[in-house]
Amino acid sequence: MFLAENPVLQRELVVNLRMHRAFLLLFGYLLALGAVVYAAWPAATRLDMTESGAGAARELVDLFFVGQYLLASMMAPSFAAGTIAGEKERKTYESLLASPLRPSAIVLGKLLAALCHLAILIFCSLPIVMLCVPLGGVSLYEVLAAYLALTASVISFGMIGVACSSIFRRTVAALTVSYLIILPLALLGAMSWWWLRDEGQTRLLLATTFLPGGCAVLVAVLFGSTARRLMHPPDVGSEGKEVVDLDTEMKKTVGMVIKGDQFPDKLFAPAKRDDLMPDGANPVYDKEMRSELFSQGTLMLRIVIQVSMFLAIPLMGVFFYVWPDMAPWYISYVVLFNVLVGPVFSADRVTSERERETLELMLTTTVSPAQILWGKLFAGLRVSSVLTSFLVWPVPLAALMVGYYWGNLGTMLCYVIVIALACLTTAVVALFCSVVFRKTVISLMTAYLVILTLFMLPPAVNYFVDNFVVGPYVAQEVVEVEEEITFDEYGQEVLRTKPTPPRRPAVVADQAVIDRALNVQRVARVLGVASPFSAIHALPLSGSQHEIRYDASTAGRAGNWWIFVGYAIFTLVLNGVLLSIIDWLFHVRWRVAG
């Protein structure tokens, strides 16, 4: 009953693999990977199979693997975070604990069922990457080592999601904490793989020994702790709901404690009201701020704050004080944090009313749809903005303490504007998804998908176009010069220089092909107006490397103020359109009954 006849595993596999979305996910995943490989395929009619000409294939394989690694890392929590928390939401958690199944069998069944989708995706993508091996520059052993590292990482991330799912009552909270833990690890792994691209032996050793060993230890520890938690569950009330008492929780809290009557905690988590609500106040906004947030406890909120600050302190020191010209990367971290936490506090504002069957009652009251809309919006926006602002305080601090930024105060102010617009966008998009969809989980996942597409796709397209569309046509025949000491025929030392072959050979093409590639690059630049990351890295920093204009291969983005202005206009228009649609849907009673 542990594996071969595990009813939990069998039920999850039968239900999940027979859904239409499983086939659609596989089709879309392979179509996207195949399109990337096809677009990045070397355009040369003759390929140099020696070591000097192997750079194109190596870069293509690295791009394929890093992209697949990040995609799998983002999908693993979405499959695993609802395994046990979903049982609590469906009110079957108590029945599962009362079954004769051992806790370890339950955890193993949930873990394997959550990872079966990713296992199929990873296995089916192997033939695509094998197409790149005949190009040279990468061996079969490197590909297999990369897939071993990918498999070990995905299993670890899935186990983290299952562990979070056993701790929290709601899938939304488990998913948020899972992403907050997994995303830094995934970015660290992707950057390490990219930095070691010229150290094949070292990368092969790490991928086959240290990484799988570390992942095995992590999985074993989390598996044991999750099984023990199911063996000795916390206090369970009616219908399998865990009882959360705020006073008891605060007494047992280790580390950060949230007190709603003190500053700054009352900005994002005010205490419950013990007096009458003043006249003219928005009852929806007051209810959302003082009841909804603390109704599920403060554990998720405390973890989010502590993990974000733990990561922000070293990043602040490195990007603001050690390398001041790298400040855009810290701002990107702040925006990425808001991308993770912003939708959480807005994606369930309306779907939770539907799930509790209270939306009809709310719409039959004297509260107008406009009051409901703005109350829901400002409640989620207030919490996410205050949490994000905790990471913004290093910006004015660095502007005052570091002389390097005294001539860049306008750019620093624009950084804050970009962060504020990103906070608004994440809240509005999540609220729109909450109005359109019926279930909170679907609303949250759709909001994440839309926001990541808007924010991440334009920079990814720009990088791809610069390196694989325009780059081959503008690569120089000689990229660096090596010096060597030789002896002439008379025995005298002579310093000679010899050209080093480029990493990627230049492609000889006519001017029409080059012009077409440059036009594609210009279109990719225009897409940057939808992404705060493109706007951040387009802002100039005087006296830094950002002022250096790149050649035709990269078509310098730094100092392009029009990208920042375009982003501000695009964001305001997008949010205005979405809010207008939400207001119209409230007036027509969209999906109120049923």
Language-model features: where?
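Transmembrane alpha-helical segments and their membrane-interface loop/helix boundaries
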Residues: M1-S73, G82, L121, P127-S352, ...
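Helix-loop-helix units of permease transmembrane domains in multi-pass membrane transporters
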Residues: L9, T83-L115, Y285, L293, ...
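Hydrophobic or amphipathic alpha-helical targeting/insertion segments
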Residues: S99-V107, L118-L126, I167
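N-terminal cofactor/phosphate-binding cores enriched in small/glycine residues
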Residues: L26, P42, T50, V66-A80, ...
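Mid-sequence acidic-hydrophobic segments that form the walls
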Residues: S78, E87, A98, G109, ...
